[in-house]
């Protein structure tokens, strides 16, 4: 393992990514944060404590981002992918935390790993990310700060995830908002 190389996925030395020496888009997104999918026939319904536990992981991803947004994909109680906002690091306006987590998952698993899974994100998804979430057929979305809260600190497309989901009857999804919202908002500078 090469320890001092700069990682493609985070831009940081020694992130632990086993693909640090490869220079390709797929390698950059296939970070070791992606864990094997453990399929079980009957998963227990997540509790509020579960939601907070996984949101704390998403918040940690956000703290490590150049722009404080993080996401975690969970299937059957196991984290299968993580993502943080890399749009500034990669000069890619589509590299939102949710999109990075989805791409990392798909670099290792087929799309069936996403169907029915839960996506935890520190900010209510924008229209682009929510569209991807719906097309991936996630079963559940849990976010911290709402679009309205985020709009007090940065530009937002003022459409809620629930409104977008209501227009996608092909992709039913459960949406829970406000989980550790104060912690997510604390990552942003105060409003001017």
Put a short name on every predicted segment.
Residues 67, 113-115, 137:
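Short loop/turn motifs at secondary-structure junctions
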Residues 70-74:
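Short beta-strand scaffold segments in enzyme catalytic cores
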Residues 111-123:
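Immediate flanking context of iron-sulfur cluster ligation sites
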Residues 89-100:
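A short, polar/charged loop-to-alpha-helix boundary motif
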Residues 2-65, 125, 132-192:
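Zinc-dependent deaminase
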